[in-house]
Amino acid sequence: MSAQSQIRQNYHEESEAGVNRIANLELQASYLYLSVGYYFDRDDVALSKFSKFFRELSEKKRDHAEDFLKFQNKRGGRVVLQDVKKPDDDEWGNGTKAMEVALNLEKSINQAVLDLHKIATDHTDPHMQDYLEHEFLEEEVKLIKKLGDHLTNLRRVKAAEEGMGEYLFDKLTLGED
């Protein structure tokens, strides 16, 4: 076990564990989005904008994980990496299914960040509260809204049933992101 950090101040062990947990969730999300992104890049799927959308999301999630790990070190916590679980699927079906998976995943990440915010509140850690509010919660809410909007539009054009709707969504909606 490593020695206690000399810079650690008002940083509870529960907060430290929560930061490591969320970093792992972000890495798992990154891994899943990478899988989805390259699924849509396959020659038999060929939806390039879906591919780009999910690969960019993968990169953002990896960046978030690194931000949490930097925060951990800045506060005098210890980074403890966990195994990154392989996604349950390798075949993502269609854009509607992929957006549903992404929306559910982002809602669970948002809940984990909210839970960590509560821990910070319970332990009177205004620095962590501010960090979570300004660096993550607003961005998560915006992403959840964007995914929800995409899902609504995919359902509207019956993308899961008709290939043309999914193709047009790929070209016209995701093409503008």
Swiss-Prot record:
GO terms for biological process: intracellular iron ion homeostasis; iron ion transport. SUPFAM superfamilies: Ferritin-like (SSF47240). Keywords: Iron, Iron storage, Metal-binding. GO terms for cellular component: cytoplasm. InterPro entries: Ferritin, Ferritin-like, Ferritin-like_diiron, Ferritin-like_SF, Ferritin_CS, Ferritin_DPS_dom. There are three types of ferritin subunits in amphibia: L, M and H chains. M and H chains are fast mineralizing; the L chain is very slow mineralizing. Stores iron in a soluble, non-toxic, readily available form. Important for iron homeostasis. Iron is taken up in the ferrous form and deposited as ferric hydroxides after oxidation. This is Ferritin light chain, oocyte isoform. It comes from Xenopus laevis (African clawed frog). The lineage of its organism: Eukaryota, Metazoa, Chordata, Craniata, Vertebrata.
